[in-house]
Amino acid sequence: EGERVIDATNKYILPGFINTHCHIESSMATPDNYCAEELAWGVTTLITDPHEIANVAGNKGIEYMLEATRALPINYYVQVPSCVPATPFEHAGCVLDAEAMAELLSLDGVLGLGEVMNVPGVLNNDSSLLAKLELFKDRILDGHAPLLGGKALQGYAASGIETDHESISWSEAKEKLRAGIAILVREGSASRNLAAIIQGVVGDSVDTRRMAFCTDDKHLADIRREGT
């Protein structure tokens, strides 16, 4: 006899689902309320990029997100935002450079580098961005490369960036897969790419071991209505 026996007659047993890329802040909910909605649909692990709160509060905002989820019954991980501020000419609450990011490396729950939105910076060897890629070179590097293809995509992939969640068509996703980038199929509130991509996956009988699902940005009302 085990310490706890569960009668699973006529029930399904599934592993917990993983939301591989999301931004809690865009739901306009606190971490505990957002996580409760995800848990209700069987999601037990969140991989987040808290760049919204980081744009306002810097490292303190990221540390808050980690601390606010520490006692929750969910596995919560952070990809440190790579583009704070989002563009060089913006006035944000802080500038999150490689030196500031280094302070977060030892924190429990920090996995790697958040979505690298500065595609021109990667392709043109921007020194500040290369310093961030170097800092996280032994960790997971998330990408953000909408409609990128050809030699530019090859250059982006050569930087070590491993994932992308911005594909809106199967042809785009397939080219990125062939470049060695894992595809996170996005089905959120603003962007819904599942139908377009999954048809190609099924039609081409693709090996899906380098594919996963994510929401990116999804509102609580949508999660309650249709799941995550």
Regions found by a protein language model. Give the residues of each.
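A cross-domain feature marking catalytic cores of carbohydrate-active enzymes
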Residues: 22-24, 49-50, 78-82, 115, ...
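Histidine/acidic residue-rich metal-binding segments in metalloenzymes
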Residues: 95-185, 192-213, 222, 226-228
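Divalent metal-coordination and catalytic microenvironments
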Residues: 10, 21, 42, 65, ...
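Active-site mouth loops of central-metabolism enzymes
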Residues: 18-31, 85-99, 159-166
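Divalent-metal coordination cores built from histidine and acidic residues
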Residues: 32-140
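Short, intrinsically disordered, charge-balanced linker/junction segments flanking boundaries
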Residues: 1, 5, 225-228
